[in-house]
Regions:
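Conserved ASCE/P-loop NTPase catalytic core
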Residues: 1-269
């Protein structure tokens, strides 16, 4: 017998389905968390290690409405490759849109390859008949180069899903404790090629940060003073504006030239 509950093993003890109801001995904190989730307010928790701060923060994410969840996507910008376009869609739609674009890209690639094969066969056939086989081979080489450099790759047009949520899942809970600037604010990966037809499109190198993945959810940071001062300033800006663009965090990286449109990051911290 313990706490008015009789049991033989711990398996006999009923566990509440909701995480907030599993918190023991923090009645006032539980009440504050419930009110903050309802009113969408930030919470500062002060306490010794092991008192349930992270558990309360995670429980808060379960109290937020599921209907508001969204996916965030990055599209290529035809006018300015270094300024990718941001689009927000309902949760679950992002994967469907990406799959649809990939199918279109496959069909376009198949059509392009078929056209290239027909042209190669035609050029080689004509050069063989006319006795100019060497010129035909040179013409085929130029064809390959033209198709590779002048005709854009279909993959360039496929948007990238940087924040994905399930329609029936809880609001996201993201622990950003001790994160460096790129992990917290987002980053753009370095492209070692950058030209020659081997480069990776700018929008495909964009990576969401913790503040973006926590959009419509909870961002938890333990010991916020462990963050760099510049990261703290940027975090304050994101809190105030509710949006924050993603750019390369390293000055020596090619990603430093890329800056997206403002990305939604309306989180509770």
């Amino acid at each position: 017998l313990f706490g008015g509950v009789r049991f033989d093993t711990t398996a006999d003890i009923p566990i509440p389905a909701s995480l907030i109801d599993q918190v023991i001995g923090q009645e006032h904190a539980v009440d504050v968390i419930k009110k903050a989730a309802t009113q969408r307010r930030h919470v500062m928790m002060i306490g010794s290690p092991g008192t349930g701060k992270s558990m309360l923060a995670k429980a808060m994410s379960e109290l937020l409405p599921k209907e508001d969840m969204q996916d965030i996507m990055v599209y290529p910008n035809q006018e300015d490759n270094n300024n990718p376009i941001i689009r927000v869609v309902p949760a679950g739609r992002g994967k469907e849109i990406v799959a649809h674009h990939k199918e279109d890209a496959k069909r376009q690639a198949s059509s392009r390859n078929t056209l290239l094969i027909v042209l190669v066969i035609g050029v080689l056939g004509i050069s063989f008949i006319s006795g100019q086989l060497l010129m035909g081979i040179i013409a085929v080489a130029f064809l390959f180069m033209a198709f590779r450099s002048l005709i854009p790759k279909e993959s360039v047009m496929v948007p990238k899903l940087i924040v994905s949520n399930k329609p029936d899942s809880f609001a996201p809970f993201v622990d950003a404790t001790g994160s460096h600037a790129g992990a917290l604010l987002g980053d753009v990966r370095h492209d070692p090629f950058q030209s020659g037809g081997l480069e990776t499109p700018a929008h495909d190198r964009v990576e969401a940060g913790a503040i973006h993945r926590a959009h419509k959810g909870v961002l938890f940071i333990d010991e916020i003073n462990s963050l760099e001062y510049q990261s703290q300033q940027s975090l304050l800006t994101a809190l105030q504006e509710g949006v924050f663009p993603i750019t390369g965090q390293s000055e020596r990286s090619s990603g430093a030239m890329v800056r997206t449109e403002p990305v939604p990051c309306r989180f509770l911290m």
